[in-house]
Design a protein with these regions (language model features):
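Compact, glycine-rich, soluble single-domain proteins
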Residues: 20-104
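N-terminal export/targeting signal detector
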Residues: 1-20, 29
Length: 104
């Protein structure tokens, strides 16, 4: 009796869902790119953002932003506070200032 293929054998490869990220400081765009996930330090706690996240706006405190990009391990930057807006797989971080954190 023939055996039907499992769904994993017939399914097309799943496209990885990414978010578009823009980190903006007073002097202009600090970084822009795509990420698997973004973690920001909101005043009410750490906020993790993935694709298909509900729209949200939050105030950020000074701390580290973690960017998990498709082609590298997690990158971190330090911000001095600001705001984050998430809408339709787009993440905009408006920061007072930003600097890259060196890998240890």
């Amino acid at each position: 009796m023939p055996v039907a293929p499992s769904p994993s054998e017939t399914a097309a490869p799943v496209e990885e869902r990414l978010v578009s990220v823009e980190v903006v400081v007073p002097s202009g765009v600090f970084w822009s790119g795509r990420a698997r996930s973004v973690t920001v330090p909101s005043v009410s706690g750490t906020l993790g953002i993935l694709a298909r996240h509900q729209p949200v706006a939050a105030t950020l405190k000074a701390g580290r932003v973690r960017l998990r990009t498709p082609d590298s391990p997690t990158a971190e930057l330090r911000i001095g506070g600001g705001f984050v807006v998430v809408d339709d797989d787009e993440v905009t971080i408006l920061a007072d200032d930003a600097t890259w954190v060196q890998a240890r």
